[in-house]
From Swiss-Prot:
Highest classification ranks of the organism: Eukaryota, Metazoa, Chordata, Craniata, Vertebrata
Function field: Recruits the ubiquitination machinery to RNA polymerase II for polyubiquitination, removal and degradation, when the transcription-coupled nucleotide excision repair (TC-NER) machinery fails to resolve DNA damage. May promote the degradation of ANXA2.
SUPFAM superfamilies: UBA-like
Assigned keywords, A-Z: Chromosome, Coiled coil, Cytoplasm, Methylation, Nucleus, Phosphoprotein
Region (Disordered): 1-26, 110-202, 385-476, 622-736, 853-905, 937-966, 982-1020, 1082-1119
Chain positions with Omega-N-methylarginine modification: 166
Matching InterPro entries: TC-DDR_regulator, UBA, UBA-like_sf, UBAP2/Lig
Name under which the protein is recorded: Ubiquitin-associated protein 2
Gene, per the UniProt record: UBAP2
Pfam family, one: UBAP2-Lig
Biased composition (Basic residues): 168-182
Length: 1119
């Protein structure tokens, strides 16, 4: 069937080619030829192939011992002559030439690659015959077989300018797709067969198909490769044919197609192709990363153009804007930048690094991410920024790539002044070779030229000035403002000073980074592939590290700039993330500015304005720097000691910078500001935590942020596009909780730009900088409260935010956000429908959890009706209370189990929001309580301890304060955190539970006041548990969510940012008021009372009263 079908298709295809050929330049003539050839081939391949061809193949396999593919190809080449095929197989390519004779003219076209063509034709025949044989033997289907031929023919056609010749060749090879005929059967030049993308897409299913295209493209040489490239619309057009081939291979998933059948043959052929195309192909294959390294390294003068091209290419792959702008910067040597072009060139390495590292790292963080991530992490961990200056060169030498190493080596000497080298190093991370060369040349050309971009140069200067000394800061400001070169000198001193300390650290981690490229190189195993491998390896390694350490990658640059070890770490890492955003968002930002923001806390804001400076480069940047540096100088004067207090200084700086930034409020400035401000805000909070702690938490933050930043940078870019509107930036950031700090910065920036509100709230934000993010989430509507709220949020952010906040949109959202909205919906149903009754899963969960605790408790929840009525009736609650009290004691002991009571249903509901309480019930039951309960208690407590405690700073934010405060936070806008915290056991339940009363029964326990607690017991179990639990249902989902995500605590905290549930987030702003009132009634009261339990009774009343109607009722959720 397949054979006949295939043949039919082929014939149909032949007919089509005639039509399409008629349409195409060389119509029927070629079509007729191709048709005849194809007819013969089709008969041989299809009609005969099923029996004859396959028998022949078997015979060949037996006689020659070759594999089936080789035999098929040989038969194909020999037109079914078994003896001839045996000779070919045994003797080698003897008949390949004769077979090519069909495509002799093609040879003429590609005599250069005649051998390659032979191999290619042979291969394509192999593959095409494979396709045919597969069609016949494997039943792949005629279409695929034809596609193979078409591809082969198409390739041949591409190579063979003469369609007739190509058609002949195609006929010789097999029924030509009409490709040989020019347009070929498919009038559109290969309905995809012609285009590499179409090739791999349509024929990707056929291993051979894409391979044919790729290999043939490489083999075909300039003619075919160029045609394919042009058709493909790949960068390959601009590059050599082999480069285009490399692109095709890289873009076309050639690796997959190289995998099995074709690999051996293709490998040798690849070697052949590699020899001729190694340098050029490497340009494209690496995904442009290799292009930068290999090409740029090889031709230093050419590297400038190559840089533009390679960067542009990488732009195509990765973040176009960042790379493009970087190209402009790099090209600033040749292109814009004028006064600052040299400075930009010296800075451009930085901006390139940051842009490439951040934007490029984010988008295509192959090398950059690898290098910068490890390097930056090392540097971040090695607090002193100066280390990075020298270290980057060393680290990035090994880290960026073996090839890059040379550039790196060059760069350290290149650092004519530490600033230049510093910039070089910064630029090193990703485009190190090119940047190193460019920066070297440029720096050599304009060591002092760095001065021209006061913003950019000043930024490095600032970073370095910071490194230099607090004492220098006044002069540093002057220097920065006056001459970056002067600051460069100072910087060179200061930078070199820290370098000795930290170089070793960076070097230590360099090998891993270098290992990654090495392994990546190893991946393909072929010369061409090696270049490609570097790209892939870098991409793969870079992708993960760059995501986790993506902020870090810029951070290395940042850390270079930042002299203070703790400060540099915490600052650089968050800033790095923001830098990523900025660089990605603002390619024109020169991310040098962004780097500046990274290097300096206020500098981050500063850099935001320098980013804006790109437009109003000198003025805004100078102003930003001037006011900025004054604070920076003061804060920097005590770099080590003020570190923690530096946040305060930073907030001032931030205030200054946003103010200054406001004027240059360019789109880049905005995006830069959000990220930088957020970094600034974030870092202070981190610095508050502790330099060392922050560095690891920051690493986590940067990891989560980095991943978030990816989206953030995209959104940030939107924000930038949005222009200076802080609200829009915030919305982009806030939607991207991932922009946690970024969002915080956004909100902060907004308020900063707004004016005083930032100054007061920014101080809070600096301490609460992370908190700013949740604030940001809700901050676009109101920043002041969110910023204030951020006080608690920041701790949540470090722990919870990275996983939950960002993940919800980035990683978590797939499961989390949908779950939240759905879960919120379920919660709405739960609240509205009294889930206990509607969803037995929750009652089951509760009884299960309660069952382990107390059967009577289970009764309370089970008699959801009674309990509900109990809500209404204190009498019902009284009995409920009695069980509740046992539950209380048990819930105290088992309040984790109690949490399952809340969570178990919720987790199922949460995780199986659709199924939740029915199907999810059992799993919620077992899965929820077990999985969720321990996570709830452990993670949530952990969250409360780590996150709630810092955020709440209430002793053992464990359950009591943590939960109460969690609600406070929730009210304040850390919705998810609040939910997760307070919601942990249940709104009132959580506080009570934290009080140790009992998760839900804690309310009853809390007062044990029969009347109220009874109500609480019943209400809590039902109204509370269900209403609250509904509310908590929100919280448990964070926990369930965390459990699901595996980062329960953080996730719950992460929820705090308000992402956890959009509903929560929604509720947060809207709910922030009504729900805040309710929650604040019980939660704040709990928090105020300081004892979740005792306060809870009174708060519970309002909660029972207000919450029942408002909170317990759907209205809460509705809100």
């Amino acid at each position: 069937m397949m054979t006949s079908v295939s043949s039919d298709h082929c014939r149909g295809a032949r007919e089509k080619p005639q039509i399409s050929a008629a349409q195409s330049t060389q119509p029927q003539k070629q079509v007729v030829q191709a048709t005849a050839e194809q007819m013969r081939l089709a008969q041989v391949i299809f009609d005969k192939n099923d029996s004859d061809f396959e028998a022949k193949v078997k015979q060949l396999m037996e006689v020659t011992g070759k594999n089936q593919d080789e035999c098929i190809v040989a038969l194909h080449d020999c037109n079914g002559d078994v003896n001839k095929a045996i000779n070919i197989l045994l003797e080698g390519n003897s008949d390949t030439t004769s077979w090519e004779t069909v495509g002799c003219k093609k040879k003429n076209f590609a005599k250069e690659n005649s051998e390659n063509k032979e191999n290619r034709e042979k291969k394509s025949e192999k593959e095409s015959s494979r396709g045919r044989g597969n069609n016949n033997r494997k039943g792949r289907g005629g279409n695929r077989g034809r596609e193979f031929r078409g591809e082969e023919n198409g390739i041949d056609c591409n190579q063979v300018d003469k369609p007739s010749d190509r058609g002949k060749r195609a006929r010789g090879r097999g029924f030509g797709r009409g490709r040989g005929r020019g347009a070929g059967r498919f009038s559109t030049q290969g309905m995809g067969t012609f285009n590499p993308a179409d090739y791999s897409d349509s024929t990707s299913t056929d291993v051979c198909g894409t391979k044919l295209v790729v290999w043939e493209a490489a083999q075909n040489g300039a003619d075919e490769g160029t045609e394919l490239a042009s058709n493909t619309h790949n960068i390959a057009q601009d590059l050599s044919n082999k480069s285009s081939y490399g692109l095709k291979g890289a873009w076309k998933n050639s690796v997959e197609e190289w995998t099995t059948e074709d690999w051996t043959e293709d490998l040798s052929e690849t070697k052949v192709f590699t020899a001729s195309s190694a340098p050029a192909e490497n340009h494209i294959l690496p995904g442009q990363s290799i292009d930068l390294v290999a090409l740029l390294q090889k031709p230093v003068p050419h590297s400038q153009a190559s840089e533009a091209n390679s960067f542009e290419t990488s732009q195509q792959q990765g973040f176009g804007q960042a790379l493009v702008f970087t190209n402009s910067q790099h090209n600033n040597q040749m292109a814009p930048g004028t006064g600052s072009s040299t400075a930009v060139n010296s800075c451009s390495p930085q901006s390139l690094s940051s842009v490439l590292g951040s934007g490029f790292g984010e988008l295509a963080p192959p090398k950059m991410a690898n290098i910068t991530s490890s390097q930056i992490l090392d540097q971040l961990k090695a607090p002193s920024l100066g280390q990075f200056t020298t270290t980057p060169s060393t680290q990035q030498n090994s880290t960026s790539h073996p090839t890059t190493t040379t550039s790196w080596d060059l760069k350290p000497p290149t650092s004519q002044s530490s600033v230049l080298s510093h910039l070089d190093f910064k630029s090193q991370p990703e485009p190190s070779p090119v940047l190193s060369q460019l920066s070297q040349r440029q720096q050599h050309q304009s060591q002092a030229v760095t001065v021209p971009p006061p913003g950019l140069e000043s930024f490095p200067s600032q970073a370095k000035l910071r490194e230099s000394t607090p004492g220098d800061s006044p002069s540093t400001v002057n220097k920065l403002l006056q001459l970056p070169s002067t600051t460069i000198e100072n910087i060179s001193v200061s930078v070199h000073q820290p370098q000795p300390k930290h170089i070793k650290l960076a070097k230590r981690r360099i090998p891993p980074a270098s290992k990654i490229p090495a392994s990546a190189v190893e991946m393909p195993g072929s010369a061409d592939v090696t270049g490609l491998n570097v790209q892939f390896g870098a991409l793969e390694f870079g992708s993960e590290p760059s995501l986790s350490e993506f902020g870090s990658a810029p951070s290395s640059e940042n850390s270079n700039q930042i002299p203070i070890s703790l400060y540099s770490k915490s600052l650089s890492e968050p800033l790095n993330t923001s830098l990523s955003m900025t660089s990605a968002v603002q390619n024109s930002t020169y991310t040098t500015s962004v780097i500046t923001s990274c290097s300096l806390t206020s500098s981050s804001l500063n850099s935001a304005s320098p980013v804006a400076m790109s437009s109003s480069y000198d003025q805004s940047s100078v102003h930003n720097r001037i006011p900025y540096q004054s604070p920076v100088s003061s804060s920097e004067s005590a770099p080590g000691t003020i570190m923690n207090g530096h946040g305060g200084g930073r907030s001032q700086q931030t205030l200054d910078t946003p103010k200054t930034t406001g004027p240059p409020s360019a789109l880049p400035s905005v995006s830069s500001l959000p990220s930088t401000t957020s970094c600034t805000a974030l870092l202070p909070s981190t610095s508050q935590h502790t330099g060392d702690l922050t560095s690891s938490p920051l690493s986590q933050l940067s990891s989560s942020l980095s991943s978030h930043q990816s989206s953030l940078s995209a959104h940030a870019a939107l924000s930038s596009s949005t222009s200076h509107t802080h609200a829009s930036v915030e919305s982009a950031s806030s939607h991207q909780s991932s922009a946690t700090f970024s969002t915080a910065a956004t909100s902060v920036s907004s308020s900063a730009s707004s004016g005083a509100s930032l100054s007061s709230s920014m101080n809070t934000a600096n301490s609460l900088c992370l908190g700013g993010t949740p604030a940001s989430a809700s901050s676009s509507s109101s920043r002041a409260a969110p910023l204030v709220t951020s006080g608690k949020a920041p701790p949540n952010l470090p722990q919870g935010v990275p996983p939950l906040l960002h993940n919800q949109y980035l990683v978590g959202p797939g499961g989390l956000l949908p779950a939240y909205p759905i879960y919120g919906y379920d919660e709405l149903q739960m609240l509205q429908s009294r889930l206990p009754v509607d969803y037995y899963g929750i009652p089951f969960a509760a009884p299960t959890a309660l069952a382990s605790r107390d059967g009577s408790l289970a009764n309370n929840p089970y008699p959801g009706d009674v309990t509900k009525f109990g809500r209404g009736d204190s009498a019902s609650p009284a009995p409920a209370t009695t069980p509740a009290q046992p539950q209380q004691s048990q819930s105290q002991t088992h309040h984790t189990a109690q949490q399952p009571f809340v969570n178990p249903a919720l987790p199922p509901g949460y995780s199986y929001t659709g199924l939740p309480y029915y199907t999810g019930m059992p799993s919620a039951f077992q899965y929820g309580p077990t999985m969720f309960v321990p996570p709830a208690s452990a993670k949530q407590h952990g969250v409360n301890l780590s996150t709630p405690t810092p955020p709440f700073q209430q002793a053992s934010g464990y359950g009591q304060h943590g939960y109460s405060t969690g609600y406070d936070d929730l009210t304040q806008g850390t919705a998810a955190g609040d939910y997760s915290k307070g919601g942990y056991a249940g709104s009132s339940q959580a506080p009570n539970k934290s009080a140790g009363s009992g998760p839900g029964k804690g309310v009853s326990v809390s007062s044990s006041t029969t009347g109220l607690p009874d109500m609480t017991g019943s209400v809590y179990n039902k109204t509370q548990t269900f209403d609250k639990q509904g509310f908590h249902a929100g919280t448990p989902p964070p926990f369930s969510l965390p459990s699901v995500l595996g980062s329960t605590g953080p996730l719950a905290s992460g929820a705090a940012p308000g992402y956890a549930p959009p509903p929560f987030l929604h509720i947060l702003p809207a709910h922030q008021q009504p729900h805040s009132q309710l929650l604040h009634h019980h939660l704040p009261q709990d928090a105020q009372s300081g004892s979740g339990q005792r306060s809870q009774p009174s708060s519970l009343q309002p909660k029972s009263q207000a919450s029942k109607p408002a909170y317990g009722n759907s209205p809460y959720w509705t809100n």
